């Protein structure tokens, strides 16, 4: 469930998820075991949740290594904010971010941004798909995650 679910007026025009989806009240994580046996703690979010950094900090506090952000940003907001928000969430929470994103012009005329992306905890884009059907794939490296967290231990220095 998205933690935020209200009408967005002119931003999404005819879209009002709040009519059909109830907002959640608790961040959700789960453990995913890779074929290698490595366990990854995954923090869940949906689309507009990306604009609320406190959700991702809650995931980080719960030990998230990977933040999952499936989305359908509009073309306008996606072009302006998508990449910078994803990279910021990765850096400020020292976690990988995987963001599958719907893109293209839809039957109702809605134009979504696309640009599915995998970002590492340093904020580097590891893989990206601009528009159209396709797959974004990349490797999650636990050694890279540990190295970045050791190099920049900001989560242990936080004020609040």
Predicted regions and their residues:
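Short, well-ordered junction/capping motifs at the entry into regular secondary structure
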Residues: 1-2
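Glycine-centered loop/turn positions within well-structured domains
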Residues: 9, 124, 146
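A short C-terminal boundary segment appended to hydrolase-like catalytic domains
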Residues: 143-160
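Short, well-ordered beta-strand micro-motif
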Residues: 29-31, 118, 137-139
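Short loop segments at secondary-structure junctions
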Residues: 33-35, 121-123, 140-143
């Amino acid at each position: 469930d998205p933690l935020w679910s209200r009408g967005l007026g002119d931003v999404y025009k005819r879209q009002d998820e709040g009519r059909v989806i109830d907002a959640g009240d608790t961040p959700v994580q789960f453990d995913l075991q890779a074929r290698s046996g490595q366990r990854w703690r995954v923090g869940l979010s949906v689309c507009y949740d990306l604009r609320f950094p406190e959700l991702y900090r809650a995931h980080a506090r719960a030990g998230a290594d990977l933040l999952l952000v499936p989305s359908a940003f509009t073309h306008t907001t996606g072009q302006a904010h998508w990449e910078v928000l994803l990279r910021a969430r990765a850096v400020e929470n020292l976690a990988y971010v995987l963001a599958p994103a719907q893109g293209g012009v839809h039957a109702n005329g809605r134009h979504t941004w696309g640009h599915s992306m995998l970002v590492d905890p340093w904020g580097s884009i590891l893989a990206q798909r601009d528009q159209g059907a396709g797959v974004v794939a990349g490797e999650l490296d636990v050694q890279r995650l540990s190295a970045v967290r050791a190099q920049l231990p900001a989560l242990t220095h936080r004020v609040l």
